[in-house]
Amino acid sequence: SADYLKKEYKVFPTPQKVTYGEGVTALRKQVNLVMGDQLDIYTRNRLKSVLQDNQVSYTTGKSAVAGATNIYLGVHGQGSQAEQNLSKVSAGLFDKIDAYALTIKDNSISIVGKDTDAVFYGLTTLKHMLKESQVPVLRNVTVEDYAELKNRGFIEGYYGNPWSNADRAELMRYGGDLKLNQYFFAPKDDPYHNKKWR
């Protein structure tokens, strides 16, 4: 049997709960995107870039396309098609920080987030799953995830030579893949970090 039938995805940070189902969903032929109105441009573009990185072509629409693999994105509580298509998730999931649920089943992918940023984090999980797959075929699965901490990021606090803008951009891309959400610029030769420190 094909490897992807028993693949267990390694996503980091490790999602809170992963439940595998039977069968697979392929992103090989027609793929249709149905995105809720509450999603910002960054979240919409995240989905498109994840698909483009895996050579998956797509169309966008307001509703499902028969015979296509439909990908639904939506914000919890907004009556989205994504939420209608989601597998049952743990009670109280969306009360947690940056919570999202991702369901792959019946030739569709649904990601519902507490808000548009949480949908972005769900898409990052999808990105990791596809990166581990030799072909764009994914096991049917439900992922429930949320953050333990609201503020997650890194500090650029240096003595001497600062990072280049290219270094910063690369670290932000890497941080995005780790679902970080903050960057602090705090050079140690800033007067408020030494002589004027209070």
Task: Name each model-derived stretch.
Residues 18, 80, 150, 161-163:
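A broad, structure-centric signal for solvent-exposed, well-ordered loop/edge residues
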Residues 1-117, 121-145:
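Acidic, contiguous N-terminal accessory segments
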Residues 140-159:
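N-terminal small/glycine-rich loop or linker at the start of catalytic domains
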Residues 70, 108, 153, 181-184:
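Beta-sheet entry/capping signal
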Residues 155-198:
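Aromatic-lined carbohydrate-binding surfaces of glycoside hydrolases
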Residues 43-45, 151, 167:
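Short, intrinsically disordered low-complexity segments
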